[in-house]
């Protein structure tokens, strides 16, 4: 599902999309909230936003978490966001991102924020500081702010993020997290001067069903990109 709790239609004051989705997995009731950066109105084409309002994600998150806890009573609440991860909340000219939101919420009110937008592999070198040159296949320590884990799997399908949680006595504990490289390669130069690109980790085979599903869309996009516009 497409989820976003903070995108509203100005003319009606109603949300344009589902704010959350509920899932039953392993006997647990899991709520997933969607949130979108309010920078969208600034960086997108304004002609598409004449009747659309992007409200502050952190404020909407508080409302939605409250509503879920009162009405749905999930065992776990996660957030999937497109807001960006900025070290120690230093977002510069960008709208506040995941770190700032986590700090503004009740402690531990989300088990995890699965983010995007800043296109970083969020693997922390130390408190409030990401690794600058993360090497694919090496251990990755996610960020943790105010009792909330924050992860981001870089960009463009380069990684799959995997988080293993243990749920016991009503509490979620992260026991393992890793970024799994999807056939990423590095350049290796040999003593004879020749070089080649080799995989960081063992190759992941293509899934025929997924390729069948996605190829028509890839071809459609390719055809549009080949149209001469000037």
List PLM regions with ranges.
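Active-site-adjacent helix-turn-beta-strand microarchitecture at beta-sheet edges
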Residues: 1-55, 93-228
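Short acidic, glycine-rich surface-loop motifs adjacent to enzyme active sites
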Residues: 32-42, 65-89
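Short, well-ordered amphipathic alpha-helical segments that serve as non-catalytic structural scaffolds
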Residues: 56-67
